[in-house]
Amino acid sequence: QLLRNLYELQISRSGQNLTILGATSGDTGAAAISGLLGKSGVTVFILYPNGKVSPLQERQMTCTGASNVFPLAIEGTFDDAQRTVKELFSDLSFREEVGLSAVNSINLARILAQSVYYLFAWLRLGPAERECTTFVVPTGNFGNVFAGWLLSRMGITIKGFRVATNQNDVLHRLFHSGEYSLDNVVPSLAPSMDIQVASNFERLLFFILDGDTRRVREVMNSFLEEGRYCFENFAVEGFSSSSVTDREIPEIIHSVNREFGYLVDP
């Protein structure tokens, strides 16, 4: 994995061991642990919400037997785990002392690596198809779809990105009404998307506000303090959204499997 190789390079250059910290709603934690288990000079701590990831994902994180891996189940939601991780990263002296580094989308290297997936898919299309392609992306933390949007900012012509959410639809509500508002996390059949604070939206906001970091901080602080923020005339070219309920998810899985013989991951 790219991050593993980058960490090895960093350790060889600095001579300092790394403490890798991440929060996961299911997918990232298992992938990070798989890539870093048994690595010399690296200790991995992954926080995840107790009882809110799938049994398979939890086993993938907790049954490795690796001495450098510490999966930590916390009470609460993914948003609580993510907030804890961000608080630790904001302590600069602690971060330097333990060689703290991130493994989920807090780390921009993860986002940049994901943008390559979109380029690979785009290159496999014919010239006529490329300019009319819309990527539909299951979205919770807004990392993967933001990676695709970044690629379009680099000059690759992509028609659009459709943000697909489950019933935890903070992003769908944002794109439709301009209101970014907190709500309770509702457990769903798509637990990796059971998120109400989409951390990578802050990165999109940086572009929307023309790189005005002071204004970005004001908006995000207001959102976190008040639980909501209303944007006037909110629109980002190329983005659309939709959400589905727990009733619709199995219906769609069954329909796709019946018509195409493909079993969709919820």
Q: For each predicted feature, which ranges?
A:
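PLP-dependent amino-acid enzyme catalytic core
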Residues: 1-266
